[in-house]
């Protein structure tokens, strides 16, 4: 119907065979790794990942993934340049294929960290009680609006110090060697 109504513009279907894909198509070679380090004094994060930033936005994307998974502001996340003394050699970055690999590695690492920190927080709540947790700045409820920002919620501890729940939890986790 569109083609009959338009003399010069036409719609059609095209099939294009592709001989060469992107990447190696060998799982062994298409891997990435990430290390996430928490600074216990302020809760800031340093992400080491093997991808090389060559203008494709890898560092920004990995930073966004880490912030989203951990539920903390991007300003608290710092990206480290690729360094083989921390992370093994990555897959190639050609055609921006290294970016999704590196971001997936960051995602999985941050998910593991989030799980460990959450388990630690719930263990504190169970073992120490609600009052102890609230006094130490681990309070998951925002009383002002009834909604929280997760770990980015700013709370006061028993000394009226303001900090994010994330900062309080990571400090306690470091103290307890979690």
Language-model segments: residues:
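Cofactor-centric catalytic regions
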Residues: 1-46, 50-69, 83-178
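Short acidic capping loops at alpha-helix termini that bridge into adjacent secondary structure
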Residues: 73-78
């Amino acid at each position: 119907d569109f083609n009959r109504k338009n003399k010069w513009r036409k719609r059609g279907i095209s099939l294009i065979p592709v001989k060469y894909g992107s990447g190696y198509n060998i799982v062994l070679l298409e891997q990435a790794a990430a290390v996430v380090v928490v600074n216990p004094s302020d809760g800031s994060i340093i992400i080491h990942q093997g991808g090389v930033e060559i203008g494709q936005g890898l560092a920004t994307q990995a930073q966004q993934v880490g912030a989203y998974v951990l539920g903390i502001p991007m300003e608290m996340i710092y990206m480290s340049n690729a360094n083989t003394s921390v992370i093994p050699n990555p897959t190639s970055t050609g055609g921006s294929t290294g970016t999704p690999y590196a971001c997936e590695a960051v995602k999985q690492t941050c998910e593991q960290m989030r799980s460990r920190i959450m388990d630690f927080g719930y263990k504190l709540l169970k073992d120490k009680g609600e009052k102890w947790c609230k006094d130490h700045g681990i309070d998951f409820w925002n009383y002002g609006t009834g909604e929280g920002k997760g770990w980015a919620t700013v709370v006061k501890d028993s000394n009226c110090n303001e900090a994010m729940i994330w900062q309080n939890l990571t400090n306690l986790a470091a103290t307890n060697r979690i």
